[in-house]
Amino acid sequence: MNRVLYPGTFDPITKGHGDLVERAARLFDHVIIAVAASPKKNPLFPLEQRVELAREVTKHLPNVEVVGFSSLLAHFVKEQGANVFLRGLRAVSDFEYEFQLANMNRQLAPDVESLFLTPSEKYSFISSTLVREIAALGGDISKFVHPAVADALNARFQKN
């Protein structure tokens, strides 16, 4: 069974992330969305909420599982029994970092391959950072995120 692990902070999960998950779900028997705790990134949403939002966005995909983690990714991928890391590339600017990460992961988990997918053209410009900035300034984020994510962002910024 081919199991792919798609790690990220997903703060929040966007339509670009969802697009990659949908395509991975067609390519692999089992897709694991691994939501990283990432405390050094100071995420807007707590880990549990990011996991729940990712589950909501992907609930229509029976071969997709969402889990949170706070350990070293190379250890976590082995715990999950995955044999592939999935990473998204939006632009050439993403490549250098992702290339370094893939090579580091190869050193730490040599049996796990890195696979890069590009999002559909209509999602290639979306980033979680930009979505958070737009939401914080009261902009319409409905084109960029699932309705449940938009609701969570809007609720979060109405409190501030």
Swiss-Prot record:
Highest taxon of the lineage: Bacteria
GO MF annotation terms: ATP binding; pantetheine-phosphate adenylyltransferase activity
GO cellular component terms given for this protein: cytoplasm
UniProt-listed InterPro entries: Cyt_trans-like, PPAT, Rossmann-like_a/b/a_fold
Catalytic activity: (R)-4'-phosphopantetheine + ATP + H(+) = 3'-dephospho-CoA + diphosphate
Keyword set includes Cytoplasm: yes
Chain sites annotated for binding substrate: 9, 41, 73, 87
CDD domains per the UniProt record, alphabetical: PPAT
Site location (Transition state stabilizer): 17
Localization annotation: Cytoplasm
Pathway the protein takes part in: Cofactor biosynthesis; coenzyme A biosynthesis; CoA from (R)-pantothenate: step 4/5
Alphabetically ordered keywords of this record: ATP-binding, Coenzyme A biosynthesis, Cytoplasm, Magnesium, Nucleotide-binding, Nucleotidyltransferase, Transferase
Description of how the protein assembles with itself and partners: Homohexamer.
Family from the record: Belongs to the bacterial CoaD family.
Chain's role: Reversibly transfers an adenylyl group from ATP to 4'-phosphopantetheine, yielding dephospho-CoA (dPCoA) and pyrophosphate.
Protein's UniProt name: Phosphopantetheine adenylyltransferase
